[in-house]
Structures are given as structure tokens and as C-alpha cells.
């Protein structure tokens, strides 16, 4: 499998570029550069920050123009106020003011004709484990944490079987981590 890494700042990469990868330095806020990076590919995986609403519009447009249909887009928990209880209140207090662009990004993607999977991950840990469960868009979010390795495993599963989780919007968390706040040790 060949891959193209489209990054704003290659200095932030903490790994050696794999032999099957090419690096393109660019910005998802630049539609032309984004199109050039996307054309000819089968799947787009996006894990962004900042103006994610504008970036999502640009990605959808570039994918449409390039004829690429499969998108995996990492978003944030809480965009639908789907996080229940004290943890939901805590989460809203911590990141609620940042969530509007993430919600707009999800809305843009869901309104498109793309074959998308949106992943709303719980608070991320660096635990060396793959242990996760999934909730659907309209279900209450479960748990408070999930390992980056778990989210990566789910993304890899979707890339390996692109027909899975088609046009799905999923919450991802570690089972049995419900609580009032995430334990991030």
C-alpha cells in the first residue's frame, strides 16, 4: 500500500518516513494543494486541528473533484452534546468552546456524497493497548478515555476493509472507563 502524508509542518513528524510513503508539505486550507495531494488516491484519512470546518469543506470539494470517495475523518467527542452525566459537563467545560467548527465539519461531511467514517474519540492516552468499543452518532457516548493505539487500530481496520463503517459517525472509547473525568495517567 502506498501512502501520501500531507502535513503542514514536517518537523513535527516523530518517525522516519516509511519506504511506501511520500511527503507533501501543504495546508488543508489551500484547496489547490489539497486537490493535488488527493488525486489518484483511494482513501483520505484526515486528523486535523484549527479551522476544521473550512478544512472539511476543502477536503470534500477536493475529493469530489478528484473522484475519490472514501474518507476517514477524526473529529471530537461532544459535538452533539452526546456525552452524558458529570463527564459530559466536565468535557463541555474543558473543550465546549472549541467544538462548533468540529460540528460544522461533521455536518459538511455527512451532507456530502462521500463514503465517510467520522470518528469521535474519547480523551486520548498513550497506553500501549488496543481495547475499544463504539457508539453510534445518536447514542450516548460511553467511557472517558481511549488509547491512540486503539484509534489507530480502528483506522487501520477501516483502511484494510473500506466497506466497513460506511457513512458512519462513531464514538470510540475504552470499555469500562465511565467516570466523572478522564483518568489520563
Task: Please place each PLM-identified region on the residue numbering.
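A conditional alpha-helix N-cap/helix-loop micro-motif detector
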Residues: 27, 52-53, 98
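Conserved Rossmann-fold cofactor-binding substructure of NAD(P)-dependent oxidoreductases
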Residues: 18-42
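Glycine- and other small-residue-rich loops at beta-strand/loop junctions that grip anionic moieties
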Residues: 26, 48, 144
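Oxidoreductase cofactor-interface core, primarily capturing Rossmann-like NAD(P)-dependent enzymes
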Residues: 1-16, 31-35, 66, 70, ...
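NAD(P)-cofactor binding segment of oxidoreductase domains
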Residues: 43-74, 102-104
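Conserved residues at beta->alpha junctions
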Residues: 7, 28, 50
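Bulky hydrophobic/aromatic packing residues
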Residues: 23, 56-57, 132
